[in-house]
């Protein structure tokens, strides 16, 4: 029944399928399988539409279907703003246009099956670099990509997007040939293969087919899935040479009492100081109204650090009091405090839209901290860095050294957004092959250790302590992504498209005539043994060969 509707009313059926599949695929936490199915429908639909009458009207109908599905998938989120419906509608309009544009562009770029995956991955790489929310909103899977997650340290999310585009290309070709019945194949005069089918108006359409590229693309997808079965994403063993266990804590006190937030965080930090080496406060844990309040609070944190030997990540919100265009705005920051005072300061580089906060322009740095216990007189150093909130939605790889631990204070307004941001942090940890201490301070937030095989998660408030393993000294094994960024992924994606287009010079190599072949001695001997001996003619007396 469904196939008959598709054959007799293909455009209407495709619009309905587009709306339903976009709702399932463009959820706040996109999964790979629904996204591939939705993208294959969109790829097939746009390829059939662009060569027919009323192309623009048909594309507007497709965009409307995507917008409806995208809007209802995000309608429950608040985005940290009271103008929730307006923000949701704006998000749906922008990203539905961005996604549809690149699919339509690929439909006009010919029949090379490698073009669409390359365009798809490159497009979302550019959007992530330009968007104020990074990869939030990108049509890219956040879950369900474990089979190809080993690619992320080498080509980042660019490789996962290429896998999604290639899978959608293969699936759309399979549906076109074997489900919809557009598989009447003939040979052109030049020997190339073509496929004939009729459109809705009854006009015969001829489309070139190259099933060899599709099969090769399918072979690449299958081959790239094998390495995941050979690797295990597990934490490092605790008791091995050159490894030390480090206690990390996310401080999430109960703020319903009469105490101020700063005192509550200080008391909770003192409770876990005997078990943790590093304690992190969530994003905007305290508010410093003046510079004097900030200095006083950091001095108290330094005294606590000196007393217990713990490093404290104090996350705060402060107003900008300097004269200028940013006066009156705020900024989020995290200060790493040790026994000797402030060791490093980090400020949010990508604040949430409509939050009226000032972004930091400089990249996060790395600080070396000395860990150990006084009673054992055994100390070691560990490299540490930090980023705040939406910074983890933006890929970054340019560190002078590999950090062994990244502090990740955050604060989200919805359970789904908490899951999204924690998955973003997991992707950044996989790219850098490091561990992130994720600490979300909202009532419905998630916190835990992500990366390096860690899977600990906690929902809502409640201070916790977890042990992680650090290699001492750290192994400086730089990945391709850390060395070259997205360049290696771009090279691999576009090489099958660009290389066949390069004209090669007509070079003819002339070889000298080969030497005369030596006699086949074995063959001659075999002939001599098998031939019959000559006999003498009795009449003439001569030898005769028989």
What spans do the regions from the language model cover?
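Membrane-embedded alpha-helical bundles of multi-pass enzymes
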Residues: 2-233, 414-415, 425-428, 432, ...
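Structural detector of well-ordered beta-strand residues that form the stable sheet scaffold
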Residues: 311-313, 385, 437
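Short beta-strand scaffold segments in enzyme catalytic cores
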Residues: 314-316, 332-336, 365, 443-452, ...
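Active-site beta-loop-alpha substructure in enzyme catalytic cores
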Residues: 124, 266-280, 358-432
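Soluble catalytic regions of membrane-associated enzymes that act on cell-envelope
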Residues: 209, 226-357, 372-378, 390
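Residue-level detector of high-confidence beta-strand sites
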Residues: 342-348, 408, 455-461
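A short, polar/charged loop-to-alpha-helix boundary motif
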Residues: 350-363, 459-475
């Amino acid at each position: 029944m469904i196939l008959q509707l598709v054959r007799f009313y293909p455009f209407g059926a495709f619009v309905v399928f587009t709306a339903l599949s976009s709702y399932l695929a463009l959820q706040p936490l996109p999964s790979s399988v629904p996204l591939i199915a939705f993208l294959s429908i969109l790829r097939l639909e746009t390829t059939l539409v662009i060569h027919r009458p009323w192309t623009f009207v048909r594309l507007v109908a497709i965009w409307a279907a995507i917008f409806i599905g995208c809007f209802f998938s995000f309608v429950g989120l608040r985005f940290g703003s009271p103008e929730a419906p307006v923000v949701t509608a704006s998000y749906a309009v922008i990203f539905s246009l961005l996604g549809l544009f690149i699919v339509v562009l690929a439909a006009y770029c010919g029949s090379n099956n490698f073009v669409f995956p390359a365009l798809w991955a490159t497009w979302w790489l550019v959007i992530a670099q330009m968007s104020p929310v990074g990869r939030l909103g990108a049509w890219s899977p956040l879950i369900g990509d474990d089979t190809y997650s080993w690619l992320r340290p080498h080509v980042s999310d660019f490789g996962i997007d290429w896998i999604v585009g290639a899978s959608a290309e293969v699936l759309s070709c399979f549906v076109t040939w074997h489900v919809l019945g557009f598989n009447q194949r003939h040979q052109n005069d030049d020997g190339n293969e073509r496929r004939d089918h009729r459109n809705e108006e009854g006009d015969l359409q001829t489309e070139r087919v190259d099933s060899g590229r599709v099969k090769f693309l399918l072979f690449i997808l299958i081959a790239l899935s094998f390495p995941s079965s050979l690797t295990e994403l597990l934490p490092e063993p605790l008791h091995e040479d050159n490894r030390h266990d480090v206690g990390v804590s996310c401080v999430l006190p109960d703020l319903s009492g009469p105490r101020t937030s700063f005192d509550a965080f200080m008391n909770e930090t003192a409770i876990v100081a005997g078990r943790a080496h590093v304690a992190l406060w969530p994003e905007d844990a305290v508010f410093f109204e003046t510079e004097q309040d900030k200095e006083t609070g950091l001095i108290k944190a330094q005294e606590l650090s000196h007393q217990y030997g713990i490093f404290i990540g104090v996350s705060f919100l402060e107003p900008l009091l300097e004269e200028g265009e940013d006066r009156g705005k705020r900024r989020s920051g995290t200060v790493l405090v040790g026994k000797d005072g402030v060791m490093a300061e980090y400020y949010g580089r990508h604040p949430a839209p409509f939050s009226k906060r000032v972004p930091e322009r400089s990249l996060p740095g790395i600080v070396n901290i000395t860990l150990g216990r006084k009673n054992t007189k055994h100390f070691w150093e560990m490299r540490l860095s930090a980023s705040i909130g939406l910074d983890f939605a933006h890929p970054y790889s340019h560190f002078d050294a590999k950090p062994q631990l990244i502090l990740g204070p955050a604060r989200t307004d919805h359970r789904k957004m908490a899951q999204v941001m924690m998955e973003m942090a997991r992707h950044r940890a996989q790219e850098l092959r490091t561990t992130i201490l994720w600490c979300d301070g909202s009532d419905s937030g998630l916190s835990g250790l992500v990366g390096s095989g860690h899977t600990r998660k906690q929902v809502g408030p409640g201070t916790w302590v977890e042990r992680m393993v650090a290699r001492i000294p750290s192994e400086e094994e730089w990945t391709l992504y850390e060395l070259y960024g997205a360049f290696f992924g771009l090279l691999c994606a576009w090489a099958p498209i660009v290389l066949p287009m390069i004209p090669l010079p007509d070079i003819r190599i002339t070889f000298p005539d080969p030497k005369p072949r030596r006699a086949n001695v074995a063959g001659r001997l075999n002939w001599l043994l098998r031939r019959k001996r000559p006999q003498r003619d009795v009449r003439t007396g001569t030898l005769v060969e028989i």
